[in-house]
């Protein structure tokens, strides 16, 4: 059944950089399948805006980390959410698509669904890892879930939630065999000698909590392995400014800070020390040995620990179903422990070969042409709605 051509409008919300990346991928697929006159609006980042998205609010207004840290931003977030819901109910777009940010989007999706506006959620929350009770909220709020990982649809099906496995766009974008030599040339790094990429996060709170520990670990590694070089991407000038005091405190480090280009920096590396998050999946798709770490405030950590189900937090370990790379979290993330684990990842050739096999299998499983599959799923929802109209 053909879709209407008269000013189709889709509302979308992405709440953080990883969501911006996913939403931009989806927008690219939708623009190929929907009328050229279709409009896309809501809350998004620069990648979405580059796809013709009209962002009515700044995405970083929604970007928070942890329970305690979010308290100060709750009034502003609630104000934005209220305005967005009123706008949706007044304008009645063809669908609302929430991209990740479940604590924000599920409330909006339920309001849309209750008003007869199809609600689609892109990125199934990790109900299989922690806070499994959220599946009840999903069942009330979401008409269709777009899943990044292959084991998620079976979980949702038990709760009566329609879903489509679409894979992960990073698996489509990253080549199966990374060009380490080319990445080193691009960054002006020596072709020979060990290189370790260090990624302490991109938020002020993350840098404050784990940045000093990562830099101390780098100093220890350089003492033990004098020929090692480090590369650290800074996504924005603001992040570089946050890192600068730590750089100044360790002038002896053979450290290259890049302007963005985190994927190039990781490609150039022999091993990676990385804060937990989506970037760990990127590192796995690049077939890199890594050490995963994080630090959050004590109370936030206690809440997360009590509500968790799995013994691991890093996506490579979750997808493998076992520990394939080490995780050093909270008080276990000492400079000495991080240095020991990272140098082991750097030097263990047998482990490197095993990880390459594991990560290649993971890569092939996730490589699904996500933009096309996600866009096709959205179009099917729109067609079904039109068929019922």
UniProtKB/Swiss-Prot annotation:
One of its GO terms (biological process) is lipid A biosynthetic process. GO terms for cellular component: membrane. Its EC number is 2.4.1.182. Keywords: Glycosyltransferase, Lipid A biosynthesis, Lipid biosynthesis, Lipid metabolism, Transferase. InterPro entries: Glyco_trans_19. Pathway: Bacterial outer membrane biogenesis; LPS lipid A biosynthesis. Disulfide bonds: none annotated. This is Lipid-A-disaccharide synthase. It comes from Burkholderia cenocepacia (strain HI2424).
């Amino acid at each position: 059944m053909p879709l209407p051509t008269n000013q189709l409008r889709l509302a979308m919300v992405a709440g953080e950089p990883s969501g911006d990346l996913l939403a931009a991928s989806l927008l690219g697929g939708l623009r190929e399948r929907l009328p050229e006159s279709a409009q896309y609006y809501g809350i998004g980042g620069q990648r979405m805006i580059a796809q013709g998205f009209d962002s009515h609010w700044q995405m970083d207004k929604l970007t928070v980390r942890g329970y305690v840290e979010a308290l100060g931003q709750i009034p502003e977030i609630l104000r934005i959410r209220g305005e967005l819901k009123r706008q949706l109910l007044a304008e009645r777009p063809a669908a609302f698509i929430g991209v990740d940010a479940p604590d924000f989007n599920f409330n909006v999706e339920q309001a849309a669904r209750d008003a007869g506006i199809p609600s689609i959620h892109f990125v199934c929350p990790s109900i299989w890892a922690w806070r499994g009770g959220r599946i009840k909220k999903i069942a009330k709020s979401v008409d269709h879930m777009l899943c990044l990982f292959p084991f998620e649809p079976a979980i949702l099906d038990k709760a009566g939630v329609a879903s489509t496995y679409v894979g992960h766009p990073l698996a489509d974008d990253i080549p199966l065999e990374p060009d380490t030599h080319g990445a080193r040339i691009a960054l002006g790094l020596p072709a020979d000698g060990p290189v370790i990429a260090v990624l302490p996060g991109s938020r002020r709170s993350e840098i404050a909590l784990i940045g000093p520990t990562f830099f101390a670990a780098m100093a220890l590694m350089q003492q033990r392995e004098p020929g090692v070089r480090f590369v650290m991407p800074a996504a924005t000038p603001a992040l570089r400014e946050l890192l600068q005091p730590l750089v100044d405190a360790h002038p002896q480090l053979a450290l290259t800070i890049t302007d963005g280009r985190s994927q190039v920096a990781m490609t150039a590396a022999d091993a990676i020390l990385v804060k937990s998050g989506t970037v760990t999946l990127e590192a796995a798709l690049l077939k890199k040995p890594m050490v995963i770490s994080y630090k959050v405030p004590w109370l936030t950590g206690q809440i997360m620990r009590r509500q968790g189900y799995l013994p691991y937090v890093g996506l490579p370990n979750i997808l493998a179903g076992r520990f394939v790379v080490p995780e050093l979290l909270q008080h276990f993330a000492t400079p000495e422990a991080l240095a020991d684990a990272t140098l082991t990842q750097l030097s263990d050739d047998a482990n490197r070969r095993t990880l390459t096999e594991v990560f290649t299998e993971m890569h092939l499983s996730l490589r699904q042409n996500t933009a096309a599959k996600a866009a096709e799923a959205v179009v099917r929802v729109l067609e079904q709605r039109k068929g019922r109209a």
